[in-house]
A protein has these predicted regions:
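C-terminal-biased regions
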Residues: 1-99
Length: 99
């Protein structure tokens, strides 16, 4: 999944969460948790050093909100942290490819 597709999926998901469309949103959050886990595992050492624990904190917060069925918490995490993480992730990957 490329950056634009992923960011669209995140935006669609937090929109569903803010609209209280629980069933649709929960499925999307599950998929995003899996995607984020894969992205975190694929990070290079340099990416991990640059991002610090941000990616792990973002994923942990999203997972905790998911487990507690906190719709607004999940939406806020996606809107504030997940979009920022994806921007950083793809920016650093593209920079590494160009070097």
């Amino acid at each position: 999944m490329n950056q634009t597709e992923l960011q669209q999926k995140i935006k669609m998901t937090y929109y569903l969460l803010y609209q209280n469309k629980e069933q649709e949103a929960i499925q999307q959050v599950q998929e995003l948790l899996f995607i984020f886990q894969n992205m975190i595992q694929q990070q290079t050492r340099e990416q991990m050093e640059l991002s610090g624990n941000f990616a792990l904190i973002m994923q942990q917060e999203l997972l905790e909100n998911f487990q507690n069925a906190d719709m607004l918490g999940m939406a806020d995490c996606l809107k504030e942290k997940a979009l920022l993480f994806t921007e950083f992730y793809f920016q650093t990957r593209n920079r590494e490819k160009n070097e």
